Amino acid sequence: MAILVLGGAGYIGSHTVYELIDAGREVVVADNLQTGFRAAVHPKAKFYQLDIRDKGALDTLFQAEHIEGVIHFAASSQVGESMSDPLKYYDNNLHGTMVLLKSMVEHGVDKIVFSSTAATYGEPERVPILEDDKTVPTNCYGQTKLAMEHMMGWVSKAHGLRYVALRYFNACGAHPSGAIGEAHNPETHLIPIILQVPLGQREAVSIFGDDYPTKDGTCIRDYIHVTDLAQAHILALDYLLNGGDNNVFNLGNGVGFTVKEVVDVARAVTGHPIPAKTAPRRAGDPAQLIASSEKAIQVLGWKPKYNDLNTIVASAWAWYKSHPHGFEEG
């Protein structure tokens, strides 16, 4: 029996595939390669190039493979883009998940671990955020992810699907082997953007807003190493395979850093001055997001290994020095 990883050529998906295969699991990857990279897929994984909105392609996969569980990363995930092009997010995230769940139900696959987001909370009423805190998304991306959670809940009631939704905070870092790391085109995540400056690919870092109600006026986020995140997905899947009920877990380190603090850490790690300039706020950005992951630690037995931002940034820097253009040559 195999694990199907949808979006397994993307950043978090590819790291999860590596962790699964290192643990001796059989893995099937499906990705449309619109934002993922074929080179990021572990060579021992079976690969299908398909879009989850293509039900015929999904049906063919489920008929051909013996799938015992699904890990679902296939979604659009840029906050800013979701505000300017919300229909893309409803199409890819909601419609795509609807097609996937329909195919799973028809083929008797009833376990799914789902990549949700801290953006489901919106502007939190308290930090650290707990799983039962209010979910009032401030951007379309978070709204579609929350709707995906609700969709799984109703499909569970109707068809017996069992699911775990993992609400991530800021994934970062690279695989310890150096084989894979973070690569987006164009790049949208803070740490890779910062590291483009010492690579000579960017003159300065833009800090979007310095007037938030935080200690230095810049947004606070909770950063989590991508391999810790990958391990949490495997633990969540095993929780379902061992009879666990539907559940939602936060994943983070429980410690927040401002944008300016992340820039300072990157300066220390790289030895580069890394100029920064202030830009207007981005629509939909909450002032701070910090997770309580106590529930995942207690229920799943999750033990993050990388809780030091310097170590996380150093792993990302090692990847970018050896792969300055990501998975693309030139």
Task: Enumerate the language-model features and the residues they cover.
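Oxidoreductase cofactor-interface core, primarily capturing Rossmann-like NAD(P)-dependent enzymes
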Residues: 161, 177, 206-207
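C-terminal substrate-binding subdomain of Rossmann-fold SDR/epimerase-dehydratase oxidoreductases
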Residues: 193-330
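Hydrophobic, Gly/Ser/Ala-rich alpha-helical and linker tracts in large acyl-processing enzymes
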Residues: 176-187, 196-197, 203
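Short-chain dehydrogenase/reductase
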Residues: 90, 138-146, 180, 184-192, ...
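N-terminal Rossmann-like NAD(P)+-binding domain of SDR-like oxidoreductases, especially those catalyzing
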Residues: 1-174
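Residue-level signature of the cytosolic catalytic core of signaling kinases
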Residues: 50, 54, 183-187, 255, ...
